[in-house]
A protein has these predicted regions:
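Bacterial N-terminal signal peptides
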Residues: 8-19
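Positively charged n-region of N-terminal signal peptides that target proteins for export
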Residues: 1-6
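Gly/Pro-rich, tryptophan- and cysteine-flecked surface segments typical
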Residues: 21-216
Length: 216
């Protein structure tokens, strides 16, 4: 069964690389929004370290597009896509944040705890976050990118054998091209389809005030 799934995934990648698909994406024009905070990238490193040390991603909703006193204004979705260091998407999810909200996520236990390819999870990889406004958070859909979110991540460094230290950096803004805007949610849908339960990262306990937005 796993062999069949891998074969299907290979066919899906081939389809994504086909001229027809590329032409369809190119026709979409530039990305919806290119300001800071729309599309952000960072890395995780030494996940499987001997000390068992974890890494953390913190996402802040700046509240720039809504009044936090209103129950429906200012909400935003953090579409999160995690890759290993061979460029394969392994997990994805979309987490709701209210205005001025702080979402804290564990790399080991939430962002890379249910990889498509199973365990062991990769030690190093890339985390991509797209700020998206919609009425229901879903990483398989990316329709209204905006610059609501700020993100920071800690990293486990190993300067010498047996010694681990923690550093922290802000996520780096990237350019959300129309190709990337189309690729990320489509690849996520393949990950969820092929994973049959695997490939979904975890946003943590649900906040009752986020019920109308939910997480996926």
């Amino acid at each position: 069964m796993k062999t069949i799934k891998i074969a299907v995934l290979i066919l899906a990648v081939v389809a994504l690389c086909s001229p027809m698909f590329a032409q369809t994406i190119s026709a979409a024009g530039p990305g919806s929004d290119t300001g800071p905070g729309v599309y952000q990238l960072n890395y995780f490193s030494n996940r499987n370290n001997a000390a068992g040390a974890d890494q953390t991603v913190r996402i802040i909703n700046s509240g720039s597009s809504g009044d936090p006193l209103s129950p429906t204004q200012g909400f935003n979705c953090a579409n999160i896509y995690t890759f290993d260091d061979t460029q394969e998407m392994l997990e994805c999810c979309s987490c709701p944040l209210s205005a001025n909200d702080l979402l804290t996520l564990s790399v080991n236990n939430q962002l890379m705890q249910n990889p498509l390819t199973g365990f062991p999870a990769p030690s190093n990889g890339v985390i991509k976050i797209v700020s998206d406004y919609k009425t229901k958070c879903n990483a398989e859909v990316l329709t209204n990118p905006n610059w609501q979110l700020l993100a920071y991540g800690t990293h486990i460094q190993q300067p010498v054998t047996g010694q681990f230290v923690t550093t922290e950096t802000a996520f780096t803004p990237g350019y959300l091209s129309s190709q990337e805007q189309a690729f990320l949610p489509l690849a996520c849908s393949f990950v969820h389809f092929l994973g049959t339960g695997k490939g979904k990262c975890d946003c943590g306990p649900a906040d009752p005030s986020h019920n109308s937005f939910s997480a996926n």
